[in-house]
C-alpha cells in the first residue's frame, strides 16, 4: 500500500507542520474547508528570525485547526549539532570553508519530534511544505516513517486540486482575505531563507544565478562583513571542551548547551564567522547553490578540530576525516539515524571526542578570517622537545637512530624504483635519462 496520498483524506485527522507563513496558513484553512480534521504542529528550533513562537499556534487555531501544538526542539537540535561537530559530519566545502549541514540537522529533529507529537494525538497522516524538487521531501519522508511506521503522507503541494485552486502566493493571499483573514504578503526578497538555531540557509530566486552572490544577502545571524561601512573589530575568544562537549566560552561555564550555542552565535555573528557560498549536489543528483550562516557551529568546529590535531595521531585523524565525509553525506540525505550513520557517529564520539578536553584561544576578525592564539590540553601529544632544533637532554632519538630508520626505507625505495622501470618498459612512463625519474607520457614537455 502506498504511503503517499495524492488527494486530501476527508474526515480524517491530518497533521501539518505549521510555520505560520502564508503557504501553511492557506493550506490549513483549505484542508479544513475541504473536510479534513487538521492538527497543527510547530517546531521551536530557535529560528533567529522568529519573533513570537506562542503566536503561531494561536494563528493555527484561528484558521480552523482542531489542535495546535508548539514543540520545543531546541535541546535536541543542539544535541545533534554537537554530535555532528564531534564526528566531523560535514561533506560539502569550498576552499576549505565547510557547510555545517544545519538544515539537514534541523530536518532530522523536526521530522522525528513533530511526528512523535502527532502520534501522541492519534494523528497518522502528515503534511508539510516541502516541494518535490528539493531534499526535504525525502528527508521528512524517511524521518517520519522511522518515527511512525503507520504514517501516511499528504502534501497539499502534491495535490492537483490544491495546486489548481491555490497555485501561487497571490492566489493564497486572496483566498485568506476572502475568508476574513486579511493576509498581506510580505515584500518579496531576492532569495528564500530557512533557519534554525544552528544556522541559516539562503537560496533560490536570484541566488540561483551564480553571478549573484553573498553581497545581495542580508545576514540574520551575523553581519555583512564584506561591506566597507560594516565595522568589525578584532576579538579574542576562548572555547573550552570537556570530553568532546563544549562547556565554556571566554571563561564562562555553561550547564545548558542551548545557552552556550546562543552565546557562540552572538560571538561568531559579530564577525560573520561561518558564512559560506556552496554549490552542492542534492539527493536527486542535481546541483543547487546556497549561501549559509553558522557562527556557533563554525566557532566550535574550529576549536574542536584544533584539539583533535593536537591530541590524536595521524591515522586516527585520517579516519575521523574520511568517516566524517561519509557521515556528512548520510546526514544530508536524511539518513542521520540509519544504522550505517549511527556506526560512524558512535565510533567518532567514543574514540575521538572522548579525548577532546582543553581550551583554544582565537582572534576573530572579518568573516572567516581568524588566528589561533593558544591551545591548551592535558591530553596533548604535541611535544615540541621531541623535535627541538636545540640540544636537549634525554632526546627521544639520536642521529644513529635516524640513520637506521632511513636505511630501512631502502626496502620500499628499491621496490618503487623497480616498479617505475617496469612501467617505463610497458609504455606507461617515458624512460628517464640517466638516473632521472621516469615521467608520465602526459608530463613530457
Curated annotation (Swiss-Prot):
Enzyme Commission code(s) on record: 6.3.4.5
Catalytic activity: L-citrulline + L-aspartate + ATP = 2-(N(omega)-L-arginino)succinate + AMP + diphosphate + H(+)
Organism domain of life: Bacteria
Keyword Amino-acid biosynthesis: yes
GO-annotated cellular components: cytoplasm
Residues binding ATP: 17-25, 43, 129, 131, 136, 194
Compartment(s): Cytoplasm
Molecular functions per Gene Ontology: argininosuccinate synthase activity; ATP binding; protein homodimerization activity
Listed InterPro entries: Arg_succ_synth_type2_subfam, Arginosuc_syn_C, Arginosuc_syn_N, Arginosuc_synth, Arginosuc_synth_CS, Arginosuc_synth_type_1_subfam, AS_cat/multimer_dom_body, AS_multimer_C_tail
Keywords, comma-separated and alphabetical: Amino-acid biosynthesis, Arginine biosynthesis, ATP-binding, Cytoplasm, Ligase, Nucleotide-binding
Enzyme class: ligase
GO annotation terms (biological process): argininosuccinate metabolic process; L-arginine biosynthetic process; urea cycle
Entry keyword Phosphoprotein: no
Gene3D superfamilies, A to Z: 1.10.287.400, Argininosuccinate synthetase, chain A, domain 2, HUPs
Listed pathway(s): Amino-acid biosynthesis; L-arginine biosynthesis; L-arginine from L-ornithine and carbamoyl phosphate: step 2/3
NCBIfam families: argG (TIGR00032), PRK05370.1 (NF003779)
HAMAP family to which the protein is assigned, alphabetical: Arg_succ_synth_type2
Subunit structure: Homotetramer.
Family indicated by similarity: Belongs to the argininosuccinate synthase family. Type 2 subfamily.
Name of the protein this chain belongs to: Argininosuccinate synthase
Originating species: Rhodopseudomonas palustris (strain BisB18)
